[in-house]
Amino acid sequence: PIALFLMAALTELFVGKRRGAGLEPAVRVLIYGGAGGAVIAAIFGWIHTGLWFGGDTAMQLHRWNGMLIAVLGVVLAALAHRRPESRTMLRIALASMAVLILAQGFLGGELAHGQNHLGISWL
Protein backbone atom coordinates (compact mmCIF):
# COMPACT_ATOMS: atom_id res chain seq x y z
CA PRO A 1 0.00 0.00 0.00
CA ILE A 2 2.90 2.35 0.67
CA ALA A 3 4.09 2.59 -2.92
CA LEU A 4 0.57 2.74 -4.33
CA PHE A 5 -0.50 5.67 -2.15
CA LEU A 6 2.74 7.55 -2.77
CA MET A 7 2.44 6.99 -6.53
CA ALA A 8 -1.19 8.16 -6.36
CA ALA A 9 -0.01 11.37 -4.67
CA LEU A 10 2.73 11.86 -7.26
CA THR A 11 0.32 11.20 -10.13
CA GLU A 12 -2.16 13.64 -8.60
CA LEU A 13 0.57 16.30 -8.76
CA PHE A 14 0.75 15.69 -12.52
CA VAL A 15 -3.05 15.92 -12.74
CA GLY A 16 -2.83 19.36 -11.13
CA LYS A 17 -0.12 20.50 -13.54
CA ARG A 18 -1.55 19.03 -16.74
CA ARG A 19 -5.30 19.23 -16.82
CA GLY A 20 -6.89 16.98 -19.37
CA ALA A 21 -3.96 14.54 -19.45
CA GLY A 22 -6.33 11.70 -18.56
CA LEU A 23 -4.46 10.60 -15.43
CA GLU A 24 -7.45 10.72 -13.08
CA PRO A 25 -8.33 7.02 -13.64
CA ALA A 26 -4.73 6.06 -12.80
CA VAL A 27 -4.96 7.94 -9.50
CA ARG A 28 -8.23 6.18 -8.75
CA VAL A 29 -6.79 2.70 -9.46
CA LEU A 30 -3.69 3.40 -7.35
CA ILE A 31 -5.87 4.54 -4.45
CA TYR A 32 -8.13 1.48 -4.71
CA GLY A 33 -5.10 -0.83 -4.66
CA GLY A 34 -3.51 1.06 -1.79
CA ALA A 35 -6.71 0.99 0.25
CA GLY A 36 -7.15 -2.75 -0.25
CA GLY A 37 -3.52 -3.39 0.63
CA ALA A 38 -3.69 -1.17 3.70
CA VAL A 39 -6.74 -2.97 5.06
CA ILE A 40 -5.08 -6.36 4.48
CA ALA A 41 -1.84 -5.14 6.11
CA ALA A 42 -3.76 -3.87 9.14
CA ILE A 43 -5.58 -7.19 9.49
CA PHE A 44 -2.31 -9.13 9.31
CA GLY A 45 -0.74 -6.74 11.80
CA TRP A 46 -3.48 -7.58 14.29
CA ILE A 47 -3.17 -11.30 13.52
CA HIS A 48 0.58 -11.10 14.12
CA THR A 49 0.33 -9.51 17.56
CA GLY A 50 -3.16 -10.63 18.55
CA LEU A 51 -4.98 -8.55 21.10
CA TRP A 52 -1.75 -7.98 22.99
CA PHE A 53 -1.45 -4.27 23.75
CA GLY A 54 2.00 -4.41 25.30
CA GLY A 55 5.23 -3.37 23.72
CA ASP A 56 7.10 -0.15 23.64
CA THR A 57 5.91 3.19 22.34
CA ALA A 58 7.22 2.60 18.82
CA MET A 59 5.23 -0.65 18.60
CA GLN A 60 2.00 0.99 19.72
CA LEU A 61 2.46 3.99 17.44
CA HIS A 62 3.20 1.67 14.51
CA ARG A 63 0.07 -0.37 15.24
CA TRP A 64 -2.32 2.56 15.56
CA ASN A 65 -0.77 4.54 12.72
CA GLY A 66 -1.31 1.45 10.55
CA MET A 67 -4.97 1.43 11.57
CA LEU A 68 -5.24 5.12 10.71
CA ILE A 69 -3.65 4.46 7.30
CA ALA A 70 -6.19 1.70 6.62
CA VAL A 71 -9.14 3.91 7.61
CA LEU A 72 -7.87 6.90 5.63
CA GLY A 73 -7.27 4.55 2.70
CA VAL A 74 -10.95 3.58 2.68
CA VAL A 75 -11.91 7.27 2.92
CA LEU A 76 -9.56 8.03 0.02
CA ALA A 77 -11.16 5.26 -2.03
CA ALA A 78 -14.59 6.78 -1.38
CA LEU A 79 -13.32 10.23 -2.35
CA ALA A 80 -11.73 8.84 -5.51
CA HIS A 81 -14.89 6.93 -6.44
CA ARG A 82 -17.07 10.01 -6.63
CA ARG A 83 -16.15 12.47 -9.33
CA PRO A 84 -16.20 15.88 -7.67
CA GLU A 85 -15.83 19.12 -9.52
CA SER A 86 -12.98 19.98 -7.16
CA ARG A 87 -10.19 17.57 -6.21
CA THR A 88 -9.18 19.60 -3.15
CA MET A 89 -10.40 17.11 -0.52
CA LEU A 90 -8.76 14.23 -2.37
CA ARG A 91 -5.48 16.14 -2.52
CA ILE A 92 -5.59 17.02 1.18
CA ALA A 93 -6.29 13.39 2.06
CA LEU A 94 -3.46 12.19 -0.22
CA ALA A 95 -1.02 14.65 1.38
CA SER A 96 -2.11 13.48 4.83
CA MET A 97 -1.62 9.88 3.75
CA ALA A 98 1.90 10.64 2.53
CA VAL A 99 2.80 12.10 5.94
CA LEU A 100 1.32 9.08 7.75
CA ILE A 101 3.22 6.69 5.49
CA LEU A 102 6.51 8.49 6.12
CA ALA A 103 5.91 8.23 9.86
CA GLN A 104 4.97 4.56 9.49
CA GLY A 105 8.18 3.82 7.62
CA PHE A 106 10.21 5.53 10.32
CA LEU A 107 8.42 3.57 13.05
CA GLY A 108 8.94 0.32 11.16
CA GLY A 109 12.64 1.11 10.99
CA GLU A 110 12.66 1.71 14.74
CA LEU A 111 11.10 -1.70 15.30
CA ALA A 112 13.40 -3.54 12.90
CA HIS A 113 16.70 -1.76 13.51
CA GLY A 114 16.36 -0.12 16.93
CA GLN A 115 16.32 3.43 18.16
CA ASN A 116 18.26 6.04 16.24
CA HIS A 117 18.40 3.70 13.24
CA LEU A 118 18.94 6.64 10.91
CA GLY A 119 21.86 7.93 12.95
CA ILE A 120 20.15 11.26 13.55
CA SER A 121 20.30 11.89 17.27
CA TRP A 122 17.73 14.72 17.41
CA LEU A 123 14.92 12.41 16.25
Regions found by a protein language model. Give the residues of each.
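Polytopic transmembrane helical bundles with strong interfacial aromatic enrichment
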Residues: 1-123
